């Protein structure tokens, strides 16, 4: 497998992500878990192309120092997440059941 075809690894250690995930209703939290499990079976090229994830760059938020860009992606019908790529890791910063909340418009 070429380096660009390696499976995505997840970093779910952000306290904001953990807090927001734990605050979801049980059904939403389970759908998020299933989506994250799916992402582990994808390459980065798969993530970029996956119609269900709707991976898109966030233009309205300045990324933290050292991060090229922040992205939002769908984890369920009602939940989106914010994160960024760091090497082969997807560092997930938060999950929001309110789509506008994922874009910082709350």
Q: Language-model features: where?
A:
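Basic, Lys/Arg-enriched alpha-helical interface segments
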Residues: 1-79, 85-106
């Amino acid at each position: 497998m070429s380096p660009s075809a390696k499976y995505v690894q997840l970093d779910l250690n952000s306290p904001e992500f953990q807090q927001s995930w734990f605050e979801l209703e049980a059904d939403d939290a389970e759908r998020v878990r299933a989506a994250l499990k799916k992402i582990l079976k994808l390459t980065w090229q798969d993530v970029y192309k996956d119609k269900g994830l709707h991976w898109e760059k966030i233009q309205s938020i300045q990324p933290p120092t050292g991060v090229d860009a922040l992205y939002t992606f769908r984890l369920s019908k009602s939940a989106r997440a914010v994160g960024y790529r760091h090497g082969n890791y997807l560092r997930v910063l938060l999950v929001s059941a309110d789509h506008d909340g994922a874009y910082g418009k709350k």
